[in-house]
Regions:
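Charge-dense, helix-prone N-terminal extensions
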Residues: 1-126
């Protein structure tokens, strides 16, 4: 992508059609789990923020699509992610085998709970 995307729609418009279909499904699952989350572009990726904090991101690479829920969810849901290529904070998957919506929702809800706990802790310190 030569120009920086201004929105997730703009980001998706520049992704190849096969990967776009997988990422649209991923976006829908994220939105269903976090309807109050704000869409944005962060570090060149399609991302979501909730209550001012990073929630999750996703993107397309040359040979795969990727979902970025952060390190903790990848570790906690390791057994459910065994069929995917993972590394700290990243889940890679082929465009023709998108992540199941139920698993995405579970990961997003875990991140929402993490952010909520962090926000409560931050509030107590003030």
């Amino acid at each position: 992508m030569k120009t920086k995307p201004k929105s997730i729609d703009d980001y998706l418009a520049h992704v190849s059609p096969d990967k776009r279909a997988a990422l649209v499904k991923l976006r829908q699952a994220i939105r269903s789990a976090a309807p109050k989350a704000e869409e944005c572009i962060s570090y060149g990726l399609a991302a979501f923020r909730l209550d001012g904090r990073f929630l999750v991101a996703f993107g397309a690479a040359a040979n795969h699509c990727a979902f970025y829920p952060g390190g903790s969810p990848v570790a906690v849901f390791k057994s459910e992610l065994k069929n995917y290529d993972t590394s700290k904070g990243t889940i890679r998957f082929p465009a023709d085998k998108p992540l199941p919506a139920a698993l995405v929702r579970k990961l997003v809800k875990f991140r929402i709970a993490q952010n909520s706990a962090a926000n409560k802790l931050r509030s107590k310190k003030r």
